[in-house]
C-alpha cells in the first residue's frame, strides 16, 4: 500500500494513527471545505508527521460529509488514480462511513479501523 485514504475527523488522533502505523508514501484526506482550504490545519498534520520522522505526500480533497453518492464517486475516482490505495475508517461522518462500505465492496480495497 502506497496510498492511504483518510476520512477526516475533528479528533486529531483519528487522522494520523493508521498513517503513522502503516507509513504510506501518500495520504489522501477527504475533508470538509474549511479543512481543505486551511493551510494552518494542513500544516499541523504535516508537522506531526515530520516530528515523527517522515514526510508523506499529503493531499487534501474537499468532500461532502453528508452526500453518500458524492463521497462514493470521490472514493472511486481516487482508487482509479491510485489503485494501490487502502481506506482508514476510524473517522468521518455516518454518510462517509456508509459510502466507504459501499466503496470497499465495489473496489475491493483493504479497509482499516
Locations of regions flagged by a protein language model:
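Long, low-complexity, Lys/Arg-enriched
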Residues: 1-85, 98-113
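PLD/PLD-like phosphodiesterase catalytic module centered on the HKD motif
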Residues: 86-88, 92-93
Amino acid at each position: 500500500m502506497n496510498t492511504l485514504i483518510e476520512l477526516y475527523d475533528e479528533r486529531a488522533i483519528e487522522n494520523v494513527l493508521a498513517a503513522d502505523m502503516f507509513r504510506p508514501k501518500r495520504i489522501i484526506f477527504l475533508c470538509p471545505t474549511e479543512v481543505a482550504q486551511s493551510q494552518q490545519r494542513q500544516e499541523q498534520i504535516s508537522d506531526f508527521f515530520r516530528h515523527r520522522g517522515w514526510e508523506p505526500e499529503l493531499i487534501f480533497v474537499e468532500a461532502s460529509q453528508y452526500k453518500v453518492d458524492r463521497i462514493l464517486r470521490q472514493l472511486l475516482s481516487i482508487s482509479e488514480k491510485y489503485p494501490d490505495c487502502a481506506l482508514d475508517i476510524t473517522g468521518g461522518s455516518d454518510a462517509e462511513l456508509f459510502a466507504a462500505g459501499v466503496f470497499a465492496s465495489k473496489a475491493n480495497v483493504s479497509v482499516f479501523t
